[in-house]
Amino acid sequence: MRLIVVSNRLPVTISPSGEIRESVGGLATAMKSFLGAVNGGRELGLEEVVWVGWSGVPSERESNDLRERLRGMGLEPVPLSSEEVEGFYEGFSNSTLWPLFHGFSEYATYEEKHWRAYRGVNEKYAKAVVALARPGDLVWIHDYHLMLAPAIVREAAEVGVGFFLHIPFPPAELLQLLPSEWRREILEGLLGSDLVGFHTYEYSANFSRSVVRFLGYKVEMGAIAVGHRRVRVGVFPIGIDFDRFYNSSQDPSVVEEMAKLREMLGRAKVVFSIDRLDYTKGVLRRVAAWERFLREHPEWRGRAVFVLVVVPSRTGVPMYEEMKRQIDREVGRINGELGELNWVPIVYLYRFIPSPTLMALYNIADVALITPLRDGMNLVAKEFVASKRDCRGVLILSELAGASKELAEALVINPNDVGGTAEAIAEALSMSEDEQCRRIRAMQERLRMRDVVRWGTDFIYSLISAKSAREEVEKALRYMEELSVDKLKSDFAKAKRRLLLLDYDGTLVPHYPYPHMAVPDGDLLELLSRLAALPETAVYVVSGRGRDFLDGWLGRLPVGLVAEHGFFLKHPGGEWKSLGKVDPSWRQYAKGIMEDFASNVPGSFVEVKEAGIAWHYRNADETIAEKAVVELIDALSNALAGSGLSILRGKKVVEVRPAGYTKGTAAKMLLDELSPDFVFVAGDDETDEGMFEVAPQSAYTVKVGPGPTLAKFRVGDYRGLRSLLEQLRPP
């Protein structure tokens, strides 16, 4: 098994003369540290690691010699022309996705030509992966540039596919700004993965909510049901090479840089920040907060200095050029108004700084001022904390950075609150050394445990697990397709204790326009009676119907009944018992929301049950209803959050009911109670998937009709299911 890493850029930089050098920072550094710690992946069972990406040289200038030298290093270049780079990278990736995913929708552009370029380049990357891949390999695709690639690879190669997003995933309301076709393809593209990873639970929840809202897929227990597959969604906060930064003050090259900086900055307290030039980083607000601090705390003038490092990015792009001019202007104004002959408030560097200088700044800085307006993680915050071997220093961190979820001991601020940030600077500079040490040590312990090696290892192991689970399902599906009715009859006849769990609507009878019309015919009543009369054979009808309906039509048969999706249970010949307690407090509120939707969707109606309330839309226009379903589920989810209720989406129905009671929980209880050695389960919609999930591996699970399922076997409709059951009953 090999690992194929896929990213926009290969982890190298090509000089004008064709020299190949390792890239510094970002994914390249993270993967180098991770793979170095696990012996190139061999400790994880990986035979080889291959990296697929663009070399950074336009294809019209990329020589065959360069491509061969890259391949000799385990790097597979994807050729991109200047035109493709412009449309794919500068266009859709950085002018549409980057601003939108960071919450700056006003900066996003929506150009058809950019979307076409994005699709075309994603296809190129996917084809390069497929050409390299061998059955059983793992493919790890990185970041927003390549969100369509997982689905393309999934269709063409027998591999495990993982995707990791390094930036925030936006709320559904922001994603909705994308044209619907683009939005759908992006979500479906990501769902081609076996595993989709994010930095934080917030981003993971945003993704899952978008999938439910825009695609209608079901999300349950950290996975999304896509056909017979379960796409796992996980949280994997990226870490750093902790020891490298913790021990940096012992590195001679860093020590030398520390001495130079101390000589230059004198005895002043050092507040420090470093960012790539970008509107998401909040540099101008940070500068404003520093000015506010100096004006409100003049005693710190001459005693503290702000070292502001801005690394050039997207040079030549008008917006970025204007941003730089604004920063230059503000820094110059503040230094001119507040500076002295022997002191400047802001030491401003607009350039790339080498690693020893950066580590020296981490070590000498008293305060790190990390205040992005939005950031997927922010490793600078982690690197600063890790570098504090002497246990002295204070981190001021934006609550809008993913790192704030892990670094709770930082002074967490809102970057839009200039006054609050100024006060945090004052607090940081005045904090006692004991308090600094308490906070730093707590954060360091967390960073040491959650380092970059754990990030990579957790993701790879989770991907292997997700891949194995999918392969088991596929294997079971292939196997069951070959089973004959004769084997079913043989297993049924040989069994000592049998259990049949049968859904009602759509499974034993057809779906009707209105629930009261779906009464059982004489043939069905006779079939159920004969099956239930067999020795050691328990037949249960497991339905979303209420007790009154099931009792009225099936109560005289020797069968068990489960009503309202597992909330009520009646054993053959027994009395009804409630498996939960009905709380009426929420019902009127939920009913009101459903009735609002029913009034807007002709042909739909609300059904009030004992435990739940259902909105049926079988008779409504499908186009109108399907759109309304997503909006209804969204409205109910928000309105009933934290209420202990669940929202079930069945076939042409949405139901609100108490959580924890499903067909699956009822089936599990019956399986545990009866201990059968033959199990037959049949159902036709999403609410029946819970029964399929808890059924033992030896069970015959039957999906009635089309659609994604966990069942191992399928029949066309209720008639096919009845025909199958007829094979089991005695003559």
From Swiss-Prot:
<feature type="binding site">
    <location>
        <position position="314"/>
    </location>
    <ligand>
        <name>D-glucose 6-phosphate</name>
    </ligand>
</feature>
<feature type="binding site">
    <location>
        <position position="505"/>
    </location>
    <ligand>
        <name>Mg(2+)</name>
    </ligand>
</feature>
<feature type="region of interest" description="Alpha,alpha-trehalose-phosphate synthase">
    <location>
        <begin position="1"/>
        <end position="464"/>
    </location>
</feature>
<dbReference type="GO" id="GO:0003825">
    <property type="term" value="F:alpha,alpha-trehalose-phosphate synthase (UDP-forming) activity"/>
</dbReference>
<keyword id="KW-0808">Transferase</keyword>
<feature type="binding site">
    <location>
        <position position="684"/>
    </location>
    <ligand>
        <name>Mg(2+)</name>
    </ligand>
</feature>
<keyword id="KW-0328">Glycosyltransferase</keyword>
<dbReference type="InterPro" id="IPR003337">
    <property type="entry name" value="Trehalose_PPase"/>
</dbReference>
<dbReference type="InterPro" id="IPR036412">
    <property type="entry name" value="HAD-like_sf"/>
</dbReference>
<feature type="binding site">
    <location>
        <position position="143"/>
    </location>
    <ligand>
        <name>D-glucose 6-phosphate</name>
    </ligand>
</feature>
<dbReference type="InterPro" id="IPR012766">
    <property type="entry name" value="Trehalose_OtsA"/>
</dbReference>
<feature type="binding site">
    <location>
        <begin position="379"/>
        <end position="383"/>
    </location>
    <ligand>
        <name>UDP-alpha-D-glucose</name>
    </ligand>
</feature>
<comment type="subunit">
    <text>May interact with the putative glycosyltransferase (GT) TTX_1305. TTX_1305 is required for the trehalose-6-phosphate synthase activity of tpsp.</text>
</comment>
<comment type="similarity">
    <text>In the C-terminal section; belongs to the trehalose phosphatase family.</text>
</comment>
<feature type="binding site">
    <location>
        <position position="503"/>
    </location>
    <ligand>
        <name>Mg(2+)</name>
    </ligand>
</feature>
<comment type="pathway">
    <text>Glycan biosynthesis; trehalose biosynthesis.</text>
</comment>
<keyword id="KW-0378">Hydrolase</keyword>
<feature type="binding site">
    <location>
        <position position="276"/>
    </location>
    <ligand>
        <name>UDP-alpha-D-glucose</name>
    </ligand>
</feature>
<dbReference type="InterPro" id="IPR023214">
    <property type="entry name" value="HAD_sf"/>
</dbReference>
<keyword id="KW-0119">Carbohydrate metabolism</keyword>
<comment type="function">
    <text>Bifunctional enzyme which catalyzes the transfer of glucose from UDP-alpha-D-glucose to glucose-6-phosphate to form trehalose-6-phosphate (Tre6P) and removes the phosphate from Tre6P to produce free trehalose.</text>
</comment>
<keyword id="KW-0460">Magnesium</keyword>
<feature type="binding site">
    <location>
        <position position="89"/>
    </location>
    <ligand>
        <name>D-glucose 6-phosphate</name>
    </ligand>
</feature>
<dbReference type="GO" id="GO:0046872">
    <property type="term" value="F:metal ion binding"/>
</dbReference>
<feature type="binding site">
    <location>
        <position position="281"/>
    </location>
    <ligand>
        <name>UDP-alpha-D-glucose</name>
    </ligand>
</feature>
<keyword id="KW-0479">Metal-binding</keyword>
<feature type="binding site">
    <location>
        <begin position="503"/>
        <end position="505"/>
    </location>
    <ligand>
        <name>alpha,alpha-trehalose 6-phosphate</name>
    </ligand>
</feature>
<feature type="binding site">
    <location>
        <position position="9"/>
    </location>
    <ligand>
        <name>D-glucose 6-phosphate</name>
    </ligand>
</feature>
<dbReference type="GO" id="GO:0004805">
    <property type="term" value="F:trehalose-phosphatase activity"/>
</dbReference>
<dbReference type="InterPro" id="IPR001830">
    <property type="entry name" value="Glyco_trans_20"/>
</dbReference>
<protein>
    <recommendedName>
        <fullName>Bifunctional trehalose-6-phosphate synthase/phosphatase</fullName>
        <ecNumber>2.4.1.15</ecNumber>
        <ecNumber>3.1.3.12</ecNumber>
    </recommendedName>
</protein>
<dbReference type="GO" id="GO:0005992">
    <property type="term" value="P:trehalose biosynthetic process"/>
</dbReference>
<dbReference type="InterPro" id="IPR006379">
    <property type="entry name" value="HAD-SF_hydro_IIB"/>
</dbReference>
<dbReference type="Pfam" id="PF00982">
    <property type="entry name" value="Glyco_transf_20"/>
</dbReference>
<keyword id="KW-0511">Multifunctional enzyme</keyword>
<feature type="region of interest" description="Trehalose-6-phosphate phosphatase">
    <location>
        <begin position="465"/>
        <end position="731"/>
    </location>
</feature>
<dbReference type="Pfam" id="PF02358">
    <property type="entry name" value="Trehalose_PPase"/>
</dbReference>
<feature type="binding site">
    <location>
        <begin position="25"/>
        <end position="26"/>
    </location>
    <ligand>
        <name>UDP-alpha-D-glucose</name>
    </ligand>
</feature>
<feature type="active site" description="Nucleophile">
    <location>
        <position position="503"/>
    </location>
</feature>
<dbReference type="GO" id="GO:0005829">
    <property type="term" value="C:cytosol"/>
</dbReference>
<comment type="similarity">
    <text>In the N-terminal section; belongs to the glycosyltransferase 20 family.</text>
</comment>
